[in-house]
Amino acid sequence: MAKGEGKVVAQNKKARHDYTIVDTIEAGMVLTGTEIKSVRAARINLKDGFAQIKNGEAWLSNVHIAPYEEGNIWNQEPERRRKLLLHKKQIQKLEQETKGTGMTLVPLKVYLKDGYAKLLLGLAKGKHDYDKRESIKRREQNRDIARQMKNFNTR
């Protein structure tokens, strides 16, 4: 766990497979009461999510937060756009890096820190199919080497 990181509620493993993560940044999320209760119950899905900068504000889209069961009329739409809390300079930097360079902002994980839901946002570049195959091959080779070293060291 990184410094200051709390309980991890959800991770986006698909993002690390589909993208090369260049940089990460922590952002707060503007949530309603029933949404934060669902997040604390780990009823959140980051798989198809992405973030974008519009009018100097950061917005999170396509992240599914399941409706809170006891929330009845106060429940929000599960995949609504949610505002991200970042400093102005951070937003300007992210906007500059994503504009026209093939970079995108993907949510990597949601965790609770001091009672607040935080989002780890990744500045990412898409991988091609051959890049994915290369990383899978590299991972398998490292696994085989580790297995052989383990067997060698136990003899």
From Swiss-Prot:
* Entry protein name: SsrA-binding protein
Q: Tell me where it resides.
A: Cytoplasm
**Which Gene Ontology BP annotations are present?**
trans-translation
Query: Which species?
Result: Streptococcus sanguinis (strain SK36)
Q: Which PROSITE patterns match?
A: SSRP (PS01317)
Superkingdom of origin? Bacteria
Described purpose of this protein according to its UniProt entry: Required for rescue of stalled ribosomes mediated by trans-translation. Binds to transfer-messenger RNA (tmRNA), required for stable association of tmRNA with ribosomes. tmRNA and SmpB together mimic tRNA shape, replacing the anticodon stem-loop with SmpB. tmRNA is encoded by the ssrA gene; the 2 termini fold to resemble tRNA(Ala) and it encodes a 'tag peptide', a short internal open reading frame. During trans-translation Ala-aminoacylated tmRNA acts like a tRNA, entering the A-site of stalled ribosomes, displacing the stalled mRNA.
GO terms for CC? cytosol
Q: Which Pfam families match?
A: SmpB (PF01668)
Keyword terms, alphabetized: Cytoplasm, RNA-binding
Q: What S-S linkages are listed for this chain?
A: none
User: What is an example of a GO molecular function annotated in this UniProt entry?
Assistant: RNA binding
Q: Which family does it belong to?
A: Belongs to the SmpB family.
